[in-house]
């Protein structure tokens, strides 16, 4: 049930992303689907970034010709639902939790961290935001402003340029204040940057080795406009730390968003927000 709700919410979230899916189902409503229609459907599915493998699966279902238009649409929906059958809603439980937000430059990490803080604060959690992007002063200032708007605590060590040290201080502070949830905003980094990826690995080691009382959740921000390149990024980040979920950003500026399917199909990373 959650998977179906999640798929519908993403398809219906924004008009740009919804349009191609609606066009596909409109074509599928025809009594007879021509070879030209199949080519059009294939083109529209590829444009949503659903991926060539999944597009080919859907085209195969259409070519089988075993269903009338209504059953065909339902079977395609069921096929997509089945692909995400292991998809689970992100659960922040009662014990202390730290969410580490990672991703490439400009993918929306800082805004995502702020939105998560608002979401969980509204749900009754005591939240601390930690600014571990020590390279970009604007990110620190932005997160500080968001923390004031949300009404949660904000941690940044202006005397340290070491992100892992900032995270250490943030978690120690959260323990002292008995906060439920720590959200860490990390610096944007290309998955090809070896030194920055090692830095991310160090952050994870600090959390896992020094703060085992915290449940660690790693979320990767995915810029919906980047398409299939997001799969490459997520795969490389996953080599540093296991990704528990993805946050799909910038859907308002693209007709894409179908990347959620190959993201889970290939890497088993669910889109949680």
Positions of predicted regions on the chain:
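Surface-exposed, interaction-prone regions with an acidic/low-complexity signature
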Residues: 8-14, 241
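Conserved Walker B
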Residues: 134-135, 187, 225, 251
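Conserved catalytic-core segment of NTP-binding enzymes
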Residues: 163-176, 192-273
């Amino acid at each position: 049930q959650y998977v179906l709700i999640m798929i519908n919410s993403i398809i219906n979230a924004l008009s740009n992303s919804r349009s191609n899916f609606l066009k596909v189902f409109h074509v599928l409503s025809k009594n007879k689907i021509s070879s030209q229609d199949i080519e059009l459907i294939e083109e529209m599915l590829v444009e949503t970034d659903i991926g060539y493998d999944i597009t080919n699966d859907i085209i195969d279902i259409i070519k089988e010709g075993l269903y009338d238009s209504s059953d065909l649409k339902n079977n395609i929906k069921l096929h997509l639902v089945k692909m995400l059958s292991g998809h689970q809603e992100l659960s922040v439980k009662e014990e202390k939790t730290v969410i580490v937000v990672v991703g490439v430059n400009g993918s929306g990490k800082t805004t995502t961290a702020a939105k998560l803080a608002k979401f969980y604060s509204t749900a009754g959690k005591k939240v601390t935001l930690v600014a571990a992007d020590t390279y970009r002063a604007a990110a620190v200032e932005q997160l500080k402003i968001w923390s004031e708007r949300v009404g949660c605590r904000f941690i940044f060590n202006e005397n340290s340029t070491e992100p892992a040290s900032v995270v250490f201080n943030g978690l120690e502070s959260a323990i002292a204040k008995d906060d439920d949830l720590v959200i860490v905003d990390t610096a944007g980094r290309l998955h090809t940057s070896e030194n920055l990826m090692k830095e991310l690995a160090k952050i994870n080691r600090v959390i896992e080795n020094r703060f085992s009382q915290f449940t660690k959740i790693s979320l990767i921000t995915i810029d919906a406009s980047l398409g299939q390149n997001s799969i490459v990024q997520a795969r490389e980040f996953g080599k540093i730390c296991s990704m528990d979920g993805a946050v799909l950003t910038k859907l308002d500026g693209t007709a894409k968003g179908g990347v959620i399917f190959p993201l889970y199909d290939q890497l088993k990373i669910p889109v949680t927000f």
